[in-house]
Amino acid sequence: RLYGKAGAPDLFLKHGRDTVASDLLDEMVRLRWMANHIEVPAVTHFVSTTDEAWLLMTALAGETAYQALEARPDERKTIVDALADFLRTLHAIPISECPFTSDHSYRLRLARKRIDAGLVEEDDFDEEREGWTAEQVWQEMHRHLPFMADQVVTHGDFSLDNLLMVDGVVIGCIDVGRVGIADRYQDLAILWNCLGEFDEALQDRFLARYGVPKPDPSKLRFHLMLDELF
């Protein structure tokens, strides 16, 4: 994070090589597209070479949703309501206007490549899958296929750390490199899982507020396992 002088915005600089450089390119083009639909950091500069990339962008104001939930336990219900409302706004963006694909078929192909290349961090799996190999996750995940996709514009990594809040309202999101058309459970599953750290009742409240009081458990499990591979 680069702190601006008085009256100037703070900035964030991301740098990476090889696959990370490719990820930064993905994030840059999505930031520019998302800026027409929802609050995201503004790209100020992007530079790339054959194997490196630098992305400079403005910093959003506020605190992360995780910080808000930690700091104000008595406000957790209203915070969760705000998260659900923001996700509904995101998912209401017309898919006809989105040029990016992030559906499960596409991400399965990427996940297979990551497994074969040994890039999956198996020691970072959720407690439910502690001790599993990436191949075990892959095999178990396929037990939940096929399913009928309910496509919307998704964030792709809709976690508490990627949502910024000011005065109880979600004002924007960050880390948008996975934005694209996919099943809505791509986002629902990740945030639902994050809220489990705080309270199962908050998980239920989030889904009900969003509009799925009776979620599809198979879709939840599939998308959580898919996320383990990234």
Language model segments and positions:
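ATP-binding pocket architecture of kinase catalytic cores
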Residues: R1-F100
